[in-house]
Amino acid sequence: MDASPNHVARLTGKRVLVVEDEALVSMLIEDELRDAGAEVVGPAISVDDALRLVETAATAGGISAAVLDINLDGQHVAPVADQLAALNVPFLFATGYGANYDVGGHGAVPVVQKPFDLEQLVATVEALACASTRR
């Protein structure tokens, strides 16, 4: 996938965790983030996978931001969100559930609705990663 001129290298040097159980959606997210210069951590397709990646990444360069699908094959992503919040890693939720989603106590976190505009997703990740003190 060619990099859009609107977001070329905006995420250079940033490590972004992708937690998404739908393979095609995950590949789209990963491609856009890489096109924007990010190093993608993951993807994780389950809560357990994501928690392992967070633990490993915390000692291997950190995580600048994360994209979390709210529902991972019936499991709520809240434990991952809680762990990221405890580490001061900013994240956003991606959901296809419209207004009927549970953010598990993280009401101030940005929510990107599926199907999402990839430019909006990258811009939101960029804002999170650049505001983060953990680069």
List where the protein language model places each region.
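Active-site residues of response regulator receiver
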Residues: 69
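Acidic catalytic/metal-coordinating carboxylates
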Residues: 46, 66, 74-79
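Two-component/phosphorelay signaling modules centered on CheY-like receiver
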Residues: 23-42
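Acidic, metal-coordinating helix/loop segments flanking the phosphotransfer/catalytic sites
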Residues: 43-65
